From Swiss-Prot:
Domain of life: Bacteria
Protein name in the entry: Proline--tRNA ligase
Originating gene: proS
Family: Belongs to the class-II aminoacyl-tRNA synthetase family. ProS type 1 subfamily.
Phylogenetic placement of the source organism: Bacteria, Bacillati, Actinomycetota, Actinomycetes, Micrococcales
Broadest EC class assigned to this enzyme: ligase
One example of a Gene Ontology biological process annotation: prolyl-tRNA aminoacylation
Subunit text: Homodimer.
Organism: Clavibacter michiganensis subsp. michiganensis (strain NCPPB 382)
UniProt entry tagged with the keyword Nucleotide-binding: yes
Domain notes: Consists of three domains: the N-terminal catalytic domain, the editing domain and the C-terminal anticodon-binding domain.
Coiled coil: none
Amino acid sequence: MSTRLSKLFVRTLREDPVDAEVASHRLLVRAGYIRRQAPGIFAWLPLGLRVKNKVEAIVREEMERIGAQEVHFPALLPAEPYQATGRYDEYGPGMFRLEDRKRAPMVLAPTHEEFFALLVKDLYSSYKDLPLSIYQIQDKYRDEARPRAGILRGREFTMKDAYSFDHTDAGLAVSYQAQRDAYERIFQRLGLEYVIVAADAGAMGGSKSEEFLHPTPIGEDTFVRSPGGYAANVEAFTTLVPESIPIEGQSAARVFDSPDTPTIATLVDLANAREPREDGRAWTAADTLKNIVLALTHLDGTRELVVVGIPGDRDIDLKRAEVAFFPAEVEPATEGDLAKQPGLVKGYIGPWSPEGPVLGSTSSTKVRYVVDPRVVDGSSWITGANVAGKHVLSLVAGRDFTPDGVVEAADVRDGDPAPDGSGPITAGRGTEIGHVFELGRKYAEALGLKVLDENGKLVTVTMGSYGIGITRNLALVAEATQDGRGLLWPASISPFDVHVVMTGKGDEIASASEELVDALDAAGLDVLFDDRPKVSPGVKFGDAELIGVPTIVIVGRGAVDGMAELWDRRTNERTPVALADVVGALTADR
């Protein structure tokens, strides 16, 4: 099939859009694939839809290969099922909410777990109907606070979401692995590099979660991996916990004067000058216990102060803290928050004071106190004494203070040991391109999805959820393959197989171009034909680079002698070829 550029609904641009932050956003707009309608909302033009449809076709082929069947749900749905599972509140302001004319609460769906479960509940009642895998490719809606990077993080986006239904955990494991394998094949066909990492389940819930991340400098996610094969999203990384230390024989806690120590560094310098260690080693930041006050806003609107104790050589990672305290919103405590707790002396906060415990559910303040996993029983710390100008030495966990719990909220750094013992980790940046979950029975229990098992007993169905961002993957392919001059699509999702550029004037050139396009069409190739009569060769070549079809055929003055040029955009090499040989050259490997 051939498409004439003179008739195609497209307008290429010479200037970058002013709001574009990344190359894929700039080039998809300039090449006429998408147009911005509002922040995070884009219209898809014919070129963009061609690529988007090809991405969807690859996903459909791989879903059908594992026996998943396609369905389609509305984007506009009643709120009640989301309320039943608790996600109506958990999503917070990220969910688009509205009411119909009868004042019934509705949503623009961010995801469809509840409705897939209800559909299966409505139609199936026996284990003999299972296992079942169904999926859809549908637009989703999330009210992003800061839409960015074009279609990489928008408020409307297209996803493939699949769901598996089994009546046993063993069956779920099989379904999960089938989807996971299908995802690997999809990303390989798209030509996207990926890393599979352990991930936090977040609002989705469930017992197991893995992300497929595409390593990229523009990624908004941090992941870590070790030489021995460990890989995790930084939010799911677990600290290697040291052994507890015997408490007996350790020095008693002792308060010392520490004026003018606003930072951990100044505190360490003072301790080394005035309170040298008995073993002769110098104090370091890792010997101090930093106590960070966070404010949690719970789903019911209540606000709670929590103090997190971490080694002083670490900082709080708010993303990890959000996971630790989910579904509450997390932010640093304000001056107003601290004013309501006069028992906490800013700059000198600690779990203990000479008058007794200051932090924890049984303390004088009743402020919840949680600590980093490295704060094990018997570990000894320098920390605030809750008295202005004073710190305490040799404060021992399990003897002098007992935290309310342990949280993973400290930052993760290169060189930290992997929790499975597979070596030191290194961190990288990436963007999520797929996510697979073993949901278990969370949604089925909330919605009453049960079937009769082999013994005639009602059992709750166990589910899996599997998502791929169609539009995000398209943008990341564009980002990864562009060469600065324009887009450069892999053949698997290029909008056309070949781009024929007619240059020069005269009936012979026009006739040769038309005949070549017809021959390529007859050979089964999808052809974009730049037949624009009043456009210079330079502009045509610039547009060809911008649009990004990887194979270009130039038909110019050489056509009089039966010659054309093959232009390989990947290598930027141009090769003379006889017009009669073009079709054979382009179909040899098909």
